Regions:
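Helix-loop-helix hairpin linking two adjacent transmembrane segments in secondary transporters
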Residues: 1-36
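Juxtamembrane intracellular "pre-TM" segments in multi-pass secondary transporters
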Residues: 37-64
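Extracytoplasmic gate region of multi-pass secondary transporters
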Residues: 54-112
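Helix-to-loop junctions at the C-terminal end of transmembrane segments
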Residues: 111-124
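Structural signature of the two symmetry-related core transmembrane helices
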Residues: 126-141
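Paired small-residue
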Residues: 149-157
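Intracellular juxtamembrane helix-capping segments at the cytosolic ends
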Residues: 163-178
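A late C-terminal transmembrane helix in Major Facilitator Superfamily
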Residues: 176-205
Length: 205
């Protein structure tokens, strides 16, 4: 929304964002291609898929996996339902209600940026707890409020609170089993499928 107001659209409207994303992606690929990365040599045999899944038997890893699922589920779910909430409760049109998605990403981006500084001063555990508390308060607010400003505040709090959950959970899971970094990384990334599970459940509900 903001980008299409500030740059020429060439009669493409919001679709102008796709060429911009493509250019950014190509630049990132080229820069990554010329970046020297020293990878550690793997010792021993690679773990099998079954051995990776067996790590879910450890409570901390299982909770981290569920945390990643919830993080992505909240992310996708908020994007899809926030405009719908505004349309149902305030009678807004789709074009106006779509600003809720932009608002979510504005606060999510701000949270990612500020999180890098906050985590220098605060422990990951405390920051994670505050982030979750912000989201819980905001979600409760979405059930209660019918005022546009308060709904916007709740959406912003969810975006800010959810901005650093993935990085905190992912890093803590790796620190828990430093000898199984590849396996743990694979499991955490597998948790991204929560983005398909939670919106489906929300749609059924």
């Amino acid at each position: 929304w903001g980008a299409t107001q500030a740059i020429p659209t060439f009669d493409l409207g919001w679709r102008i964002l796709f060429p911009i994303y493509m250019i950014v992606a190509v630049i990132a690929i080229l820069l990554l291609n010329v970046t020297q990365i020293k990878e550690e040599k793997e010792e021993g045999k690679p773990s099998t898929f079954g051995q990776c899944l067996a790590l879910l038997g450890k409570p901390f890893i299982l909770l981290s996996f569920i945390g990643i699922m919830c993080h992505v589920g909240i992310d996708v779910g908020t994007n899809t339902t926030a405009p719908k909430i505004l349309m149902e409760r305030l009678g807004m049109g789709l074009d106006d209600a779509a600003f809720a998605t932009s608002l979510y990403f504005i606060f999510r981006t701000a949270g990612c940026f500020l999180g890098s500084f906050i985590l220098r001063k605060m422990s990951p555990k405390s920051f994670f707890g505050i982030s979750v508390l912000m989201m819980l308060i905001a979600m409760a607010g979405l059930f209660i409020f019918h005022d546009k400003t308060m709904i916007y505040v709740c959406i912003g709090l969810i975006g800010f609170g959810n901005s650093n959950v993935f990085s905190v959970v992912f890093s803590q899971a790796l620190l828990y089993l430093p000898g199984k970094k590849n396996e743990v990384s694979g499991l955490m990334i597998m948790g991204l499928f929560g983005g398909t599970v939670f919106p489906l459940a929300m749609g059924v509900a």
